[in-house]
Structure formats: C-alpha cells, structure tokens
Amino acid sequence: MRRSLILTTIVVASLIVPFSTSAHADQKFIVDCLFAHRAKDDPIVYPRHPGASHMHDFFGNRSTGAFSTYRSMLRARTNCDMAGETAAYWAPTLMRGNGTIVTPRRIKIYYRSGLLPGRRTNPFPKNFRMIAGGVHSIGKYSGWNCDGTALSKTARIDCSGRSVGHTYVRGEIIFPMCGRMKAGRIVTDSVNHRSHVAYGSHKTGCPRTHPVQLPAIKVNIRYGISNCKLARCHLVSDMMMGAMVPGGSRPR
C-alpha cells in the first residue's frame, strides 16, 4: 500500500544500553552524537548476519555491527558528548538521485520524562531495543523538516533559503514511550521489534495494552545537504522495499 509517490519512510532503530538509569528516569536531557560509521548491518533485524541489510548510518556506540550484543556495547566507546552513553542508533542511508551518499553531520537524541506528570517514568531495562518510524508514522511521529518547520512526508524539501542554523535537511523520529510488563518485568523486545511498545497521549497517558510509562525519545538527524528537492533525495531503504519510484516507500 503506497501512500505517496514521493513518500520517504525514515526508520530509526535503537539498541539502548542504559546509563545511570535511576538518575535519569525523571529528567530531561539531550545527547549529541556524531556520525560513527556506515554498514549493511542491522543487529536487531538481522543479528549475526553481516551484510544482510540495506546500508545504514550508525551513530553513538562505535562498535555497532551485526554481532553487537549488550555486553559488547558496554565495553565499547561512543562518539556522543555524554559520558557513559553507549546506546546505538541507526537509520537507512540517505542518497541523492545521482546515487551519491549524503553523509549525516550529527544526531541529537532528546530524552524526557513520560507523558503524565506525577506518574513514574520507568528507566529502560538492560538490553532494551525498538524500531520506530515507517509508513504508518510518517507525518505524525516521523518525517522531514528544516529544523523547526512542520514535518514533511518527503525528504525532497528545500532548506537553503532559511535563516542561519536552519538550512540543513533533518530527519525526525519520535519513539514510542509506553511499554508492556510480563512476569513483573518490562518487556525488552518483540518478534517485530515494535509491538512491545506503543505511543501514548499527553491527555490520557499510556494505553491499557502498554501501561508502563518509559522515557520519551525524539531523534533528529541533521544531514549535510540543504536542498534535497534539487538533489532528488531518497533513502536507500526506498529502493529495497518495492517502491515503484525513488522516494516512494512501502512498509516492510
């Protein structure tokens, strides 16, 4: 089911290695990370199968790859500005229409306490992982903008004429902030890496199916390009999902 011919689905995955979770569970803070490396790996979807995925850009933990585990990531270094942050984030590589790669400049991860004030925000448990984004979230929980503008459903936007500091194309993802409990513990993963988490509302909180309030995460990826409309940008995943044209995506 294709929603738009130029719909570009940005999907971001995260393998979270908690750092001082009790200290940060009810705070707001920002983690700023540089681009780490690029590889055809996905340790969540294709664990222990190097080269099985389309190309991804990796941020944060420098060791992330097909064989990454919770323990291996704890021992690795990070390129983030917060000491002890060993979480990993990755997204499909952004391409120009001529086939060249657009390298991201940096990624910012915004952590904040949960939806409803006064309710406990549970820290992420060890080895927590999830995937966010895709065709069903585009325009609401994910999309593209020029740093502060409204979300667009396509990466083909022009930020070149905007004010200083707002001239870079950005991909934005909001992760689900509600989880499930099983046998007294927070569920850390699911078969599709999505169904163990859900989105909630600032009015009603978390849904009954996923009553555990988790830290809310928003990810902003700033790319080294101002005019993706002229460059005819698309994600490499668009070409792997059966899209009829570059920039058009179908869900996995």
Question: How would you label these PLM feature ranges?
Answer:
Residues 1-9:
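Bacterial N-terminal signal peptides that target proteins for export
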